[in-house]
Amino acid sequence: MALFLARHTLSGTGAGCHGRGPAPDVSEVDLTLQALGERGFSRLLDLGLACLDLSYVEMREFVVWGRPPASEAAVASTPGSLFRSHSSAYWLSEVERPGGLVRWARSQTSPSSLTLAPHLGPSLLSLSVVTGGGCGAVAFCNAFFLAYFLVVRSVFPAFSDRIAAWICDRSPFCENTRAVARGYRGLVKRFLAFVFERSSYDPPLLRQNSRPVERCFAIKNYVPGLDSQSCVTVPSFSRWAQSHASELDPREIRDRVTPATAPSFVADHASALLASLQKKASDTPCGNPIQWMWYRLLVNSCLRSAHCLLPIPAVSEGGRKTGGGVGEELVGAGGPCLSRDVFVAIVSRNVLSCLLNVPAAGPRAYKCFRSHASRPVSGPDYPPLAVFCMDCGYCLNFGKQTGVGGRLNSFRPTLQFYPRDQKEKHVLTCHASGRVYCSNCGSAAVGCQRLAEPPSARSGWRPRIRAVLPHNAAYELDRGSRLLDAIIPCLGPDRTCMRPVVLRGVTVRQLLYLTLRTEARAVCSICQQRQAPEDARDEPHLFSSCLEVELPPGERCAGCRLYQTRYGTPAAQAHPPGEAGGGFSRQSPAS
């Protein structure tokens, strides 16, 4: 739809115009809208602001920042305001409320109010005829939208063509007050989405973030764009091979030109590749990737090998080398000694540990790993799981909920389990990548071990019982009288229970022979308070082992089969539970 007016003279009492009398000639506005230029849009903006009784500065502040002018400044700037009791700041604030625009328009166009400012009536009538927007409150709403759109055009002149197309195609913007009964934001959202080619754009145009610090922390949740300046420029091997295809054998190109058979210029290419990587790696913000790659390659190679020979980097306090290997040390570009880092990493992996293997010296080590619906052996909470850092050797799940129903996986933290620095060791999770890190050293090498494992070929067909220490100095236990605190699985008469139990003040010697007999401190509180069923012969107990429910030999778990081979029939089969020698009594069954 095109706006229409060509040297028009307005007069008369149009319907809904309340008989305001003859209007001044507005023929100076040349508005055959195909011929609208900058002067025509400026005249339209002046007419719209005159109808709204607002200045350009006030309207621009409202459109750009969404804030009305101060009440005092508005009253001073418009001495002949349409409403003597309310300033423009009041009505611009009223527009933000649901239905505020319609209330403002109706009050502005009421006959009793227009008599206070008779110069506004002709401006509104002129703009109504220009835009075809009707009279009364509807014309006032169209004047508000036209002024809003033209202010956006003056603020963003680069989008003037799209804004002009919107004004020409969509005028009048509302044909009745019901279209804007809920407010002006719906139409303005569609206008801004069309102009800026966005799926959604809420007014105002600019917004100030009231929490800039929190927004900086949330930047990691967004995927940043590729920065060409941060890319490492390296020679392309494929282009080099194509350019030297006539000089190389096809098999050498296929095998990526091994150094043994490569021509002399291959070494030049390798040198150029290394030089370009070193040039870019020296000032990379994330560190030196070349040194880190060498470090990971050397550490992984030594850890996977059965034996490795490491130079001892003996360095004095002054930084001068006083001993160690005969050859030169591996030093990265601008970085510290690489051999020292590799030495520390490998030695810490092989020395620092928080786990002890308790010898399976007695029947209490042979647990039943029978799985049923109420207690899946392969579940996340049974047997208890120890999460530890493979670099610093600390246990990371003291008092932490790990997995579904993680009460059996978390060890209650006590003062004994915060050694030296009294710092709680736990796992940090990256919300961007999902990787876990050690809170003590920042390593991503996190391992898991069950405190109880069934017999297998890997363990020499012997069960494994592990104890978790509060520190990472398991190799420091050099004598049998050394006192320590540890967490072990339950070693009570119930062979199916493996809940974690805290042992305090136990010696190394007592820990070595802990599986020979049942000790009260090695039994969990649930097993100590458990009552026997009334008749276990008719209905097997929920926590009965494979031998107690008399499963066929082929369906028994590895722990029960090995237990029967070594110790025969358990006492729970010979005596009913609850009686002397029974599996649920406080006495240990005969071995």
Curated annotation (Swiss-Prot):
Keyword field: Early protein
Pfam families, A to Z: Herpes_UL49_1
This protein's GO CC annotations: viral tegument
Keyword Chloroplast belongs to the record: no
Any single GO BP term: viral process
Coiled-coil positions: none
Region named Disordered: 571-591
Keyword check for Membrane: no
Superkingdom to which the source organism belongs: Viruses
UniProt subunit comment: Part of a trimeric complex composed of BGLF3, BFRF2 and BVLF1.
Family per record: Belongs to the Epstein-Barr virus BFRF2 family.
Name of protein: Late gene expression regulator BFRF2
Organism, scientific name: Epstein-Barr virus (strain B95-8) (HHV-4)
